[in-house]
């Protein structure tokens, strides 16, 4: 793990390069948006949680075979054997985001939403 941009976007070393990864099926509140009015305190909480859980740790990426509309890799991130994307939902830091379709981990995400 190299750097946390915000609650749902990280930078990792991948194939010898720093690559931006957008976490799938989550959408945390804004914390580093260029329009400062869009940044909210829960976005900072989500960003700090992601830093606490991922910085300095080895993560496993389950990448989609294509990039997102902003050119970022799209992935499920696993840390300590757990799906971190689902964890963000379970912690109440993101909804289960299905704008682009349901997840292969749909059951886990739906259970996580109910635990909030």
Can you describe what each PLM-predicted range is?
Residues 1-116:
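Small beta-barrel nucleic-acid-binding modules, primarily SNase/OB-fold domains
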């Amino acid at each position: 793990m190299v750097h946390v941009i915000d609650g749902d976007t990280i930078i990792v070393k991948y194939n010898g390069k720093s690559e931006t990864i957008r976490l799938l099926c989550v959408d945390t509140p804004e914390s580093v948006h260029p329009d400062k009015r869009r940044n909210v305190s829960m976005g900072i909480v989500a960003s700090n949680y992601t830093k606490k859980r991922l910085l300095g740790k080895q993560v496993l990426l389950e990448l989609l075979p294509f990039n997102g509309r902003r050119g970022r890799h799209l992935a499920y991130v696993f840390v300590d054997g757990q799906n971190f994307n689902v964890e963000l939902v379970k912690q109440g830091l993101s909804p289960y985001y299905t704008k682009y379709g349901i997840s292969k981990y749909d059951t886990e995400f739906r259970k996580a939403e109910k635990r909030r």
